[in-house]
Amino acid sequence: MGVCVFFPLCLPCPGALTYIREAQFISSWTPADPRHKQLKMFLQRFVTVGGAAIGARSTMGAMGAIGAIGAKGTMNNIGRRMYHPKVIEHYTHPRNVGSMDKTLPNVGTGLVGAPACGDVMRLQIKVNDKTGVIEDVKFKTFGCGSAIASSSYMTELVHGMTLDDAAKIKNTTIAKELSLPPVKLHCSMLAEDAIKAAIKDYKSKRTSTTTLH
């Protein structure tokens, strides 16, 4: 049997790669197989919207597309086992996706992760200079479902918090809320790193502004 020529294109997405590994039969599809065409269509739709890994509305939606072409719902069953409903909710309806002008003095930007590892997270906070309260939060993330869900939940968590309180948030809080499995704990760690990096960036701007005056 031939090997699916589109398989290498899935490598940037660890989530999709996991699904494909789970369904080893995909690698045996030939170009003549109708499912091969459906997989190609999925890959063409696998794009980023607003920086969040959203194809067919989200990477989760795209993975659902793979599930739809699996035999007897095999992929869908795998997906249900891998992702908690809370992850799916944040993944299909990510909160606060977007960006802010990083040059503004009251906006802190945290960029963490590495493309080579498959997960890159950017989280931005808008802070009230007088009260130190986070008034707005935005994120853009490229990564698996757990990475996007962790980012989305983090934005909800820190909105309205003071910088001091936000800096105390641990990845375990996120992991517990989303019921992340051990293999996905690094996603919650990225979210913790992102908020700390954003706070650090904001504070460094404040220091620079104070020095200039």
Curated annotation (Swiss-Prot):
Its main location: mitochondrion. Binds 1 [2Fe-2S] cluster per subunit. It is found in: Mitochondrion matrix. InterPro entries: ISCU (IPR011339), NIF_FeS_clus_asmbl_NifU_N (IPR002871). GO terms for cellular component: mitochondrial matrix. Pathway: Cofactor biosynthesis; iron-sulfur cluster biosynthesis. One of its GO terms (biological process) is iron-sulfur cluster assembly. This is Iron sulfur cluster assembly protein 1, mitochondrial. It comes from Candida glabrata (strain ATCC 2001 / BCRC 20586 / JCM 3761 / NBRC 0622 / NRRL Y-65 / CBS 138). GO terms for molecular function: 2 iron, 2 sulfur cluster binding; ATPase activator activity; ferrous iron binding; zinc ion binding. Its cofactor is [2Fe-2S] cluster. The keyword Transmembrane helix does not apply. CDD domains: IscU_like. The keyword Iron applies. Keywords: 2Fe-2S, Iron, Iron-sulfur, Metal-binding, Mitochondrion, Transit peptide. Scaffold protein for the de novo synthesis of iron-sulfur (Fe-S) clusters within mitochondria, which is required for maturation of both mitochondrial and cytoplasmic [2Fe-2S] and [4Fe-4S] proteins. First, a [2Fe-2S] cluster is transiently assembled on the scaffold protein ISU1. In a second step, the cluster is released from ISU1, transferred to a glutaredoxin, followed by the formation of mitochondrial [2Fe-2S] proteins, the synthesis of [4Fe-4S] clusters and their target-specific insertion into the recipient apoproteins. Component of the core Fe-S cluster (ISC) assembly machinery. Belongs to the NifU family.
